[in-house]
């Protein structure tokens, strides 16, 4: 049973969070001139990559992404923006994440040709987390049936539970059937959408036999229990202790399931890091979604923060907590551990910084400046680079479908 192990790790994570209470925010400071020069250098590199893709890849109905990955212009952009050596990173890996990405998109489009891009990307985000876990475990990077199935359960179940035409009772009945399928009970399938979900569970069963890998299904049931709780309307405000535990359990359970569906079993070292990593991702999501959550009265640590001081304290604690989590990362060798730590550190930094920029009205100007000064390009220049990417991607998508 993983429940006891899970509870112990959540308790330890909560103590780690409490340990961040009085820590001050310390950031490396880049001068505005340095940030401007870095921004211009990255922008120039980004424009070269955009031109490269537009001239050599856009007209191809099946572009070779592995060839694109090897282009010197793209490698230079990654090196400048993410401050890491893509060649050294790739040399430490087995397999290829680009091929895993292509395989996933192909499988989705083959089975659900009308699925919106937003839902595909939602599932793809989880595939990338599982690919990162394959890297940590020293396994060959490849899309497995379990990775495909578990990642697709996100949009498939969300679509059903978000359907305005279904009553709360119907959604509750579906959750009961889903719980039965996860336990191996052959509950009746009522709709085509439910059939798709059931088939995903069967794919997982095909890779991980229940008798040999019981903890895989226990981890899936942890997520399911959180989903059932979410159907209950939030009424009385939760106290801080309750809110913290619910948040930590929700984030940790998702990534722990990722780990089990990659490895079948988890060492204590892996279980601990994936618990912490899941919590960081959940807190970062809550930070990003705080306005929307507050609008619909969805309680999270960040949607309940009512002033600059509270927002800044929570964000500073998240920054320190994410750094403490990364210390626990596991990998088969020191070289790969270094590269993975650098990659996740940069991605966490971007996630948190982007959210601070989005919700800058909830922070004091001083705090915003401190955060911005610690980013190589500064927050506003970083946002400009992201805008260039968004606009260009939308343009490519329009041309692709025309």
Briefly describe each language-model feature range:
Residues 1-148, 156, 218-237, 392-402:
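Conserved N-terminal diphosphate/IPP-binding helix and adjacent helical/loop segment
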Residues 73-80, 181, 322, 351:
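Hydrophobic core of alpha-helical transmembrane segments in multi-pass integral membrane proteins
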Residues 84-153, 159-175, 181-294, 360:
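All-alpha helical catalytic cores of prenyl diphosphate-utilizing isoprenoid enzymes
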Residues 170-187, 296-318:
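Functional transmembrane or membrane-interface alpha-helices that line membrane-embedded catalytic
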Residues 186-215, 311-356:
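Primarily interfacial, aromatic-capped hydrophobic alpha-helices that serve as membrane anchors
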Residues 249-253, 278, 339-348, 352, ...:
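Alpha-helical transmembrane segments of multi-pass membrane proteins
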Residues 285, 308-314, 379-381:
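Alpha-helical membrane-embedding segments
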Residues 350-402:
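Acidic, carboxylate-rich catalytic segments that either coordinate divalent cations
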């Amino acid at each position: 049973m993983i429940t006891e192990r899970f509870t112990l790790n959540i308790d330890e994570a909560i103590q780690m969070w409490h340990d961040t209470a009085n820590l001050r925010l310390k950031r490396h400071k880049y001068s505005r001139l340095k940030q401007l020069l870095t921004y211009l250098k990255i922008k120039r590199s980004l424009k070269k990559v955009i031109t490269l893709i537009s001239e050599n890849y856009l007209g191809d109905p099946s572009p070779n992404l592995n060839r694109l990955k090897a282009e010197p212009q793209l490698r230079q952009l990654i090196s400048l923006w993410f401050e890491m050596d893509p060649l050294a990173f790739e040399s430490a890996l087995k397999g290829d994440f680009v091929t895993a990405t292509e395989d996933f998109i192909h499988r989705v489009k083959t089975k659900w040709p009308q699925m919106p891009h937003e839902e595909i990307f939602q599932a793809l985000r989880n595939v990338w987390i599982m690919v990162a876990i394959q890297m940590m475990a020293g396994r060959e990077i490849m899309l497995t049936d379990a990775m495909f199935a578990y990642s697709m359960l996100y949009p498939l179940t969300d679509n059903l539970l978000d359907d305005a035409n279904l009553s709360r009772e119907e959604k509750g009945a579906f959750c009961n059937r889903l719980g039965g399928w996860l336990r191996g009970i052959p509950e009746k399938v009522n709709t085509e959408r439910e059939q798709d979900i059931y088939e995903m569970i069967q794919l997982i069963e095909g890779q991980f036999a229940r008798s040999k890998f019981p903890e895989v299904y226990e981890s899936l049931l942890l997520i399911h229990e959180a989903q059932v709780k979410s159907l209950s309307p939030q009424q009385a405000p939760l106290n801080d202790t309750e809110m913290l535990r619910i948040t930590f359990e929700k984030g940790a359970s998702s990534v722990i399931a990722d780990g089990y569906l990659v490895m079948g079993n988890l060492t204590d070292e892996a279980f601990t890091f994936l618990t912490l990593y899941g919590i960081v991702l959940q807190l970062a999501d809550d930070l990003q979604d705080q306005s929307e959550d507050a609008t619909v009265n969805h309680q999270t640590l960040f949607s309940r923060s009512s002033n600059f001081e509270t927002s800044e304290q929570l964000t500073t604690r998240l920054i320190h907590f994410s750094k403490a989590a990364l210390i626990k990362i596991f990998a088969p060798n020191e070289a790969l551990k270094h590269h993975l730590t650098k990659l996740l550190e940069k991605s966490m930094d971007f996630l948190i910084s982007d959210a601070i920029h989005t919700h800058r009205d909830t922070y004091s100007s001083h705090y915003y400046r401190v955060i911005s000064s610690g980013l190589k390009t500064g927050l506003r220049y970083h946002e400009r680079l992201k805008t260039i990417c968004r606009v260009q991607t939308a343009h490519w998508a329009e041309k692709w479908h025309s």
